[in-house]
């Protein structure tokens, strides 16, 4: 149990970085995909999200190590010293959750955009971008925040596997 307590701060740091990365990428991606529904951007982003949901953390971790550590030499393949060493583990851990958050945001935005109050605000002459940012996105984030809260526990569990793959 002492070993667990020694490694727990690193687990928390990895989980926080992965969640931050997932939210910063996924919420705008899902919102834009909803606004540009049935376009090439929407299709590509949702295919990437589907791949993200389907890909196991250990497999993505190995692919990231092969590409960014061994081939390109941009990031260290193991260790937990410095900021560069947390990038690949955070991407590997956050990618699956990023996909889920993007899909939830898109779905919630599509539902919100179709609400009567959004049509009313648009009929009053408010610019579409303002309607999306101030009215639709704010209300669409309620289910997204719920999903984010639930995924924190999954990330804490998944970080053990990520730490093993990256010898972090």
Language model features: what each stretch is:
Residues 1, 69-88:
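Hydrophobic alpha-helical transmembrane segments of membrane transport/permease proteins
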Residues 1-7:
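Membrane-helix entry/capping segments
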Residues 8-41, 57, 80-168:
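Alpha-helical transmembrane segments of integral membrane proteins
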Residues 42-46:
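Membrane-interface helix-entry/capping residues at the boundaries of transmembrane alpha-helices
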Residues 47-76, 92-97:
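Membrane-water interface segments at the C-terminal ends of transmembrane alpha-helices
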